[in-house]
C-alpha cells in the first residue's frame, strides 16, 4: 500500500501543506508553473486557506498528471505541532475517503519544519490514515460497500528506506488502535470474557507469544477472591488472561500491563440507573488498550520483555452476586470490605496487579475505564494518571506526548491511603465515598502495587467519544494503545 518516490507522478489526489507565512513556498511555486499562475491568484483571493485544518481542493483540469490537489492549511509555523498535523491529516483522509480516492500521494517535505522531520510526518500520515478513516463495525443487515485507499505514496527527497520504515510503524500503530476500537464497540452478548480470552490467544499465537488463560478453578487455587467476587453473580465464567512477550534473552526488566476487562457493568447490587448503564459494554477499554499495544509489540518486535494481564468478567445482578458489606480476600492476602459493588473494576485489577507481579513484572502500568470522577476532574480529552514512581511516570508521560494522548497526574497523599484503609472489618475498603473518587480508586490500587514501580491510567473519559472527530467516528477511541506501545519502544532510553 505504501510507496516512496522522489518525483511526483500520476495520482488521483495529492496532499500539499500550506503554512500561513509560506504561501509561496517552493512546492507551491513549482505547482503554480503548471497552473500558469492561477494558484497564486487563488491564494491572494483566499480561495486557498492557510487556516489550521482548512482543506482546499483544486482540480488540475488536465494541466498536470494529478487529478486533484488537496491543500491542507496548517496555520503559523510557530504553532505547528504533531497534534495539529494529526488533526489536519485525519480530516484530509476523511475527505479523500468521502471522495472515494484509491490512489493518493503526499508531498511529504512540504509538511517538514525544524520541529517535525520527514520521518515524523511519514509516521503520523500512515497512522492517521487508518485512524481517520476507521468505520464503526455494525450488525446492520444492509451493509454498504466501502472504497479503500489502495495506494499511498510519499514524495520526498529523504532516504526511501527510512521513510518506508516510518510509514510501516505508523500504519501498525493506526491498525492496532482500530483493533482496540472494534473490541470496545462490540456488544456484551458477543464479547464475553470467554470471547475476549479467545481473541487474546489468537493474538498471542499470531505473534508467537506465550500465554496463559486461568479458569475459575485455577483462580480459586491461587486465591483470586477479588476477581471471583465480581464474577459471583454471572453465568459467564471469568478469565484471567496473560500474554507474555520475550524480547530479551533474560527475563529481566519486565514491563507489566494490566487492563481492566469488565465486559459489561450493571453496577451489581449498587445498581446503575438506566442512563448510566447504557454504554457499559465499553468497560473493558483497558483490556482493549493492552491488547492493542501487544499487537503493535508483536508486529514491531522491540527488545523488551512485556507481559499483559487482563482480569475479565461481567458484573451483573443475581441471587449469587456479591453484595455491599461482603468481606473478600484478594490474591495478595489483603482483605477488602465491599462498600460499593459498582467499584468492581478496582477489585478485578487488584488481583490482576498481584498476578502480574507473580509472573515477574518489574514495572506496572494499569489501564482502566475506572471512575466517572476522572471525567468530572479532567473531561473527555485527558487521561488521569497516578503513580508511586516519578521516573516511570515521566517515561509514560513522554510516550503520551509523542502520541498526542493527553495525560495529567493526580496525587496520592497519606490521608488518601488512610481513607482506603478505613474499615472495621478488613484491611481495606473499596469505596470510601464520592469525594475525590478518581484519587480513591487509584490509591486503592497502589495498595497492591506496593513497592513495584507503578502507573495507573484512568481512561474513563478518553476511551470513547460522543461524536465524530478528526481521528475517527463516535464511539471507541482506542485510548492509550499507542502510548503503551511507544513506552515499550522507548523504554530505558536516555
Swiss-Prot record:
EC number: 3.4.11.1, 3.4.11.10
MF terms in GO: manganese ion binding; metalloaminopeptidase activity
InterPro entries: Leucine_aapep/pepB (IPR011356), Macro_dom-like (IPR043472), Peptidase_M17_C (IPR000819), Peptidase_M17_leu_NH2_pept (IPR023042), Peptidase_M17_N (IPR008283)
One GO CC term, this protein: cytoplasm
GO terms under biological process: proteolysis
Pfam families reported in the protein's UniProt record: Peptidase_M17, Peptidase_M17_N
Catalytic activity: Release of an N-terminal amino acid, Xaa-|-Yaa-, in which Xaa is preferably Leu, but may be other amino acids including Pro although not Arg or Lys, and Yaa may be Pro. Amino acid amides and methyl esters are also readily hydrolyzed, but rates on arylamides are exceedingly low; Release of an N-terminal amino acid, preferentially leucine, but not glutamic or aspartic acids
Residues reported to bind Mn(2+) 1: 265, 342, 344
Cofactor binding note of this UniProt entry: Binds 2 manganese ions per subunit.
Predominant location: cytoplasm
Keywords: Aminopeptidase, Cytoplasm, Hydrolase, Manganese, Metal-binding, Protease
Domain of life of the native organism: Bacteria
Residue positions of the active site: 272, 346
SUPFAM superfamilies hit by this protein: Macro domain-like (SSF52949), Zn-dependent exopeptidases (SSF53187)
Gene3D superfamilies assigned: Leucine Aminopeptidase, subunit E, domain 1 (3.40.220.10), Zn peptidases (3.40.630.10)
Family statement: Belongs to the peptidase M17 family.
HAMAP family: Cytosol_peptidase_M17
Function statement: Presumably involved in the processing and regular turnover of intracellular proteins. Catalyzes the removal of unsubstituted N-terminal amino acids from various peptides.
The protein, known as: Probable cytosol aminopeptidase
Organism: Bacillus cereus (strain AH187)
Record gene name: pepA
Amino acid at each position: 500500500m505504501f510507496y516512496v518516490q522522489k518525483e511526483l507522478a500520476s495520482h488521483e489526489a495529492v496532499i500539499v501543506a500550506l503554512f500561513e507565512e509560506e504561501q509561496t513556498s517552493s512546492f507551491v511555486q513549482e505547482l503554480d508553473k503548471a497552473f500558469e499562475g492561477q494558484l497564486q491568484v487563488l491564494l491572494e483571493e483566499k480561495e486557498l486557506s492557510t487556516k489550521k485544518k482548512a482543506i482546499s481542493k483544486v482540480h488540475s483540469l488536465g494541466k498536470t498528471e494529478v487529478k486533484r490537489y488537496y491543500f491542507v492549511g496548517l496555520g503559523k509555523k510557530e504553532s505547528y505541532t504533531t497534534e495539529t498535523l494529526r488533526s489536519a491529516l485525519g480530516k484530509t483522509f476523511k475527505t479523500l475517503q468521502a471522495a472515494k480516492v484509491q490512489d493518493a500521494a503526499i508531498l511529504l517535505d512540504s509538511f517538514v519544519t525544524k520541529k517535525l522531520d520527514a520521518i515524523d510526518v511519514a509516521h503520523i500520515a500512515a497512522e492517521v490514515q487508518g485512524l481517520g478513516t476507521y468505520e464503526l463495525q455494525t450488525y446492520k443487515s444492509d451493509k454498504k460497500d466501502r472504497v479503500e485507499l489502495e495506494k499511498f505514496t510519499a514524495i520526498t527527497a529523504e532516504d526511501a528506506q527510512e521513510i518506508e520504515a516510518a510509514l510501516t510503524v505508523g500504519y501498525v500503530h493506526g491498525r492496532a488502535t482500530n483493533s482496540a476500537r472494534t473490541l470496545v464497540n462490540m456488544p456484551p452478548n458477543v464479547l464475553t470474557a470467554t470471547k475476549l480470552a479467545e481473541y487474546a490467544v489468537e493474538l498471542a499465537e499470531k505473534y508467537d507469544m506465550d500465554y496463559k488463560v486461568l479458569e475459575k478453578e485455577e483462580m480459586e487455587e491461587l486465591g483470586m477472591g477479588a476477581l471471583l467476587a465480581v464474577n459471583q453473580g454471572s453465568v459467564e465464567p471469568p478469565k484471567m488472561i496473560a500474554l507474555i512477550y520475550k524480547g530479551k534473552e533474560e527475563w529481566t526488566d519486565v514491563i507489566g500491563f494490566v487492563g481492566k476487562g469488565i465486559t459489561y457493568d450493571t453496577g451489581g447490587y449498587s445498581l446503575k440507573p438506566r442512563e448510566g448503564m447504557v454504554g457499559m459494554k465499553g468497560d473493558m477499554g483497558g483490556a482493549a488498550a493492552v491488547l492493542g499495544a501487544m499487537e503493535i509489540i508483536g508486529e514491531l518486535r522491540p527488545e523488551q520483555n512485556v507481559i499483559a494481564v487482563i482480569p475479565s468478567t461481567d458484573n451483573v445482578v443475581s441471587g449469587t452476586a456479591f453484595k455491599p458489606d461482603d468481606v473478600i480476600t484478594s490474591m495478595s492476602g489483603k482483605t477488602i470490605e465491599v462498600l460499593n459493588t459498582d467499584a468492581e473494576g478496582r477489585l478485578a485489577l487488584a488481583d490482576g496487579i498481584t498476578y502480574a507481579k507473580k509472573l515477574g513484572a518489574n514495572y506496572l502500568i494499569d489501564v482502566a475505564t475506572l471512575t466517572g470522577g476522572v471525567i468530572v476532574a479532567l473531561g473527555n480529552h485527558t487521561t488521569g494518571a497516578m503513580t508511586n514512581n516519578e521516573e516511570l511516570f515521566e517515561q509514560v508521560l513522554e510516550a503520551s506526548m509523542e502520541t498526542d494522548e493527553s495525560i495529567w497526574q493526580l496525587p496520592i497523599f497519606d490521608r488518601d491511603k488512610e481513607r482506603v484503609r478505613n474499615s472495621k472489618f478488613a484491611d481495606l475498603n473499596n469505596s470510601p465515598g464520592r469525594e475525590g473518587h478518581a484519587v480513591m480508586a487509584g490509591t486503592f490500587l497502589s495498595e497492591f502495587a506496593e513497592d513495584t514501580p507503578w502507573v495507573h491510567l484512568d481512561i474513563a473519559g478518553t476511551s470513547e467519544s460522543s461524536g465524530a472527530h478528526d481521528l475517527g467516528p463516535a464511539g471507541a477511541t482506542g485510548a492509550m494503545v499507542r502510548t503503551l506501545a511507544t513506552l515499550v519502544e522507548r523504554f530505558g532510553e536516555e
